[in-house]
Structures are given as C-alpha cells and as structure tokens.
C-alpha cells in the first residue's frame, strides 16, 4: 500500500534533505538510523515507480551518516541501488553475492 505518489515522495524527501544535509552525522544514532531507513525506502520507491528525481540526494545523505559499523549496512545497500540504477550489473551482483555469502538472503529478496 503506497501512502504517497512519487511527486509527494520527492517533495517530502527534498525537505528531509534540506534539513539534514552536511550535518547528519552530528545527530543521534536513532535519528541517523531513521534517516538512513527513509533513504533506502525512498530508493526502493524510485525502483518501484521507475522515477525519482532525488536519488543522488539519498546517496548523499547516506554518505553523511556517521562512519560506525551499526550504520554500515545503509552504505552497502545504497551502493547496491546506485549500481543497479546505473546498470552496473557486475558491481550490484557482487554486493548481492556478498550479502548471500554472509547469511543476509533476506536483504537480497527485497532488492531489485
């Protein structure tokens, strides 16, 4: 069930980006995790809707997360989407294999 169409998602994501860009790593772990989750959800909706003008902004916000292991999966999944949208099958398949090799098949089943 979709709550927003792609235009509404883009609008709300733009607001999120404006607020958190270049300073996200200074927020609490909980806030960073929430924003990372929203970014991944936005990328998934871009895939489902085959559009989304703020994909690069989602990548940027994820790159602004603190460099701690607990947030590392966001970067891995971000790279998967980035390679998938850029049709770099060698790289996104290597991430897919990495996830499977590490027992994370559940992630793979949810990815494009």
Predicted regions and their residues:
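Short, well-ordered coil↔helix boundary/capping segments
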Residues: 33, 37, 52, 56, ...
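Boundary/linker segments of alpha-helical solenoid repeat arrays
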Residues: 24-29, 66-76, 101-112
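Long C-terminal appendages of proteins
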Residues: 61-80, 84-88
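"A position-specific structural signal for the A-helix of alpha-solenoid helical repeats
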Residues: 37, 41-45, 74-84, 110-112
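C-terminal non-catalytic interaction modules
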Residues: 82-112
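Mid-protein regulatory/catalytic core that forms ligand/cofactor-binding pockets
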Residues: 1-48
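Structural motif corresponding to the intra-repeat A-B loop/turn of tetratricopeptide repeats
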Residues: 6, 49, 85-89
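Alpha-helical repeat scaffolds
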Residues: 9-23, 52-66, 89-100
């Amino acid at each position: 069930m979709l709550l927003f169409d792609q235009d509404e998602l883009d609008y709300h994501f733009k607001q999120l980006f404006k607020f958190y860009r270049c300073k996200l790593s200074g927020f609490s772990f909980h806030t960073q995790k929430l924003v990372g989750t929203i970014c991944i959800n936005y990328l998934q909706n871009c895939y489902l809707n085959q559009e989304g003008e703020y994909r690069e902004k989602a990548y940027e916000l994820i790159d602004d997360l603190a460099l701690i292991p607990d947030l590392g999966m966001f970067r891995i999944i971000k790279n998967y989407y980035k390679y998938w949208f850029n049709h770099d099958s060698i790289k996104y398949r290597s991430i897919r294999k990495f996830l499977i090799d590490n027992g994370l098949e559940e992630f793979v089943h949810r990815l494009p």
